[in-house]
Amino acid sequence: MLYANPNTESSPVGFRKKYDNFI
């Protein structure tokens, strides 16, 4: 659940990673 992680949303790299994982 990376997309549910607040730390991932705060980080620009994590933001793109959460989207990459979603797709």
UniProtKB/Swiss-Prot annotation:
Source superkingdom: Bacteria
Single GO term (MF): aldehyde dehydrogenase (NAD+) activity
GO terms of biological process kind: alcohol metabolic process
Known catalytic reactions: an aldehyde + NAD(+) + H2O = a carboxylate + NADH + 2 H(+)
Keywords, sorted A to Z: NAD, Oxidoreductase
UniProt EC number: 1.2.1.3
Signal sequence residues: none
Family statement: Belongs to the aldehyde dehydrogenase family.
Protein name: Aldehyde dehydrogenase
Organism lineage: Bacteria, Pseudomonadati, Pseudomonadota, Gammaproteobacteria, Moraxellales
